[in-house]
Amino acid sequence: MLDAATPTHQRVRGRAMARFTGRRLRDLHQSGSAKVLIPRVFGRAPEVVFLNTAGGITGGDRLDYALHVDDGTCVGTTQTAERAYRSHGPMGRVSTRLTIGQGATLHWVPQEMILFDGVALERDLSVEMAGDAELVMLETLVLGRAAMGEVLRDLHLRDRRRVTRGGKLAMVEAIGLGPDDFASSSPAGLNGAVATASLTLMAQDAEDRLNALRAVLPTDVRSAASAWDGRLTARFLAPQAYPLRRAVARAVEQVTCGALPRVWQI
């Protein structure tokens, strides 16, 4: 008797790219499940909203996003929280490429990524910015679905961020998370936290904005901020997702001196 064939699951593929020159959309590409939305905004920087129409990512999926800002100011985000589901095969992969031209500003503030139990995910974020450009970059992770009482016991996450500034390497971060990182007795891991965020500002006046940011850091979320060499970084850890989201929102508004993207307020 022949062995039953292993079913082949449909995999998500998507590519989306947008390029702005000032307030004008210069180039746009989208294919597969990756889409680009350009909301109509008035009196503020143009916003680019990336969307995964598959509703989430799982093993074997591949999404590629790119946003290029030649000059002026642009805000990039995601339409909603992204979900990374249990994988029954290879790792899912999300790649994001950002470029910021001379004197340009990019606020890259996607909404949170929610990790389900059994997730296997690899994310790679690469930024190339001019020496006098400005970057605000936010990354937020929520570990499990609190409303369902989910506790992550099996997960594999590899998260990499790399920034070059004026052609020189300015920042590299590589994060790996596994089941052992969620033990409440592990201060080297997340020490019991289920939501974490990292906010980075790369700007010539980054050090000058540190005190104003520290002034809005909350007391109900573990957080700290520091600045050096044209870079400001704030870290957040929280036992629940909502206090973290609220804290991050205030920090982003303070650092960018502006309102959050409109989709954050839905």
UniProtKB/Swiss-Prot annotation:
<comment type="function">
    <text>Required for maturation of urease via the functional incorporation of the urease nickel metallocenter.</text>
</comment>
<comment type="similarity">
    <text>Belongs to the UreD family.</text>
</comment>
<comment type="subunit">
    <text>UreD, UreF and UreG form a complex that acts as a GTP-hydrolysis-dependent molecular chaperone, activating the urease apoprotein by helping to assemble the nickel containing metallocenter of UreC. The UreE protein probably delivers the nickel.</text>
</comment>
<keyword id="KW-0963">Cytoplasm</keyword>
<dbReference type="GO" id="GO:0016151">
    <property type="term" value="F:nickel cation binding"/>
</dbReference>
<dbReference type="GO" id="GO:0005737">
    <property type="term" value="C:cytoplasm"/>
</dbReference>
<dbReference type="InterPro" id="IPR002669">
    <property type="entry name" value="UreD"/>
</dbReference>
<keyword id="KW-0143">Chaperone</keyword>
<protein>
    <recommendedName>
        <fullName>Urease accessory protein UreD</fullName>
    </recommendedName>
</protein>
<dbReference type="Pfam" id="PF01774">
    <property type="entry name" value="UreD"/>
</dbReference>
<keyword id="KW-0996">Nickel insertion</keyword>
